[in-house]
């Protein structure tokens, strides 16, 4: 049997948002590897072995998947959202680079998925309609000073921003520091979108002006989107539409 490895994104939660390409790869898999809650999204079937693991063993998980693929198994590594956005694709290639030479000859495919920032943005309109950046606010794998620097520079450049992993029980104070950086740098009422558990039954959307945003509005299941100085709200009876215009006037202070 010829083995191989697919690194796939399961999207934000709704099964309807899993791509046909990913669905086909899962149907052919002999082994599924991933963080426990993501593996739990895969229905068991005959001939399929599930390998759930903790969220702090990404490199070990990648190495295990590569070892099985080298043995001829059809392995799928699952991530939520897109596998190349703060997810397992980078960990797999890190393992390939530092591992045995024969891993470099394996068939390895990265199959994209719908990442949380795009699902969240779609719920309210087009807040990422112009230049934007995505920042992971977890300091598990990078120093906090770097996070603050990137947030400050993005705010000063007037990017729209998407924040992954804004707050957790282990990191209760970091998001408060981010909000302070934003308020100091922006000093305006640009909208902040808190999109929790998008595309699941627990979905909740909240939009507030930046000065009114508070840390307790976010948790690990929340995607936070911050608009630019040009981002607009269109009022309506339900949640307003939010969009960032695609053009920037010549006299915008950034000449």
Task: Enumerate the predicted regions with their spans.
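Structural signal for conserved beta-strand scaffold positions within catalytic alpha/beta enzyme cores
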Residues: 34, 52, 110, 133-136, ...
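Short, active-site-adjacent cap segments at secondary-structure transitions
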Residues: 39-41, 84-86, 117, 199-202, ...
